[in-house]
Amino acid sequence: IDENIENSLGQYVEGVPEHYCRVHGQIYALPVTPSVQILYYRKDLFESPICKRTYFEQFHEELQPPKTFEEYNRIAAFFTRDLTPSSPVPYGSTITLGSTGVAGSEFLARLFAIQENLYGADGQIHLDSLQCQQALAELVQLRRCTSPEYCGWWTQTARRFAEGNFAMSILYSNYASDLSSHSSHVVGNVGYSMMPGNNPVLGGGSLGVSKYCKRPKDALSFIKWMCSEPLCSASALLGSTSPCRRTYDN
């Protein structure tokens, strides 16, 4: 449609075009809301001298953001009042299970913490592998550390975490704005960290032109407008995540 489309990629944050624009080197789309899973936690709880001392006495380890999902579940249990009566909050972690696709995101977060991607050494997906079994087991174990009224979508998860009843939450970055909203009870007390395993699931989305489009040039013109400044900065102010470098330089 546009042989100069490559020129549109220079405005984006480093790394975004590779994940949101190209497939096997070919440009198929432009990024509109790039995002990534981030671990958010109650900084006031993790830095509490009482919580830190109690955790150390119980597990002989420092209380800090978890590096593995085994640690994540242990900390979640520590902050779940039904399991630890002295916990200052009712639940250790949120969980988002609204549909097969949403629940799959929780599963993949745990799988990617122990293997690079979905595929085994033979290039096939093996859901009965030991790694997949471990990821599923870690997800099932977390159910006892969260509210029985699980969240259906990440906006709901962010609102629930903002109520102040959870110690940790895994959210996509473009859904986290409610943590600092006027109604949030955790403003100033939210820390953030890389996901356990340092291999988070990417989220967000890109826009491309369908091959069935009757007016592809007009469609591409609209997409370029949607995926560039000043619109991306305006979207960021409304809680979205911008793909453009200029947003973060302002």
Feature map (PLM): residue ranges:
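Pocket-flanking alpha-helical
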Residues: L9-A29, E70-P88, A176-S183
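Short helix-loop capping/hinge motifs at secondary-structure junctions, enriched
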Residues: L45-F56, R144, Y212-A219
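Glycine-centered hinge/linker elements that transmit conformational signals in sensory
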Residues: N73-T80, G101, E106, R110-W153, ...
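Paired acidic/hydrophobic, glycine-rich loop segments that form the ligand-binding mouth/hinge
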Residues: A167-Y172
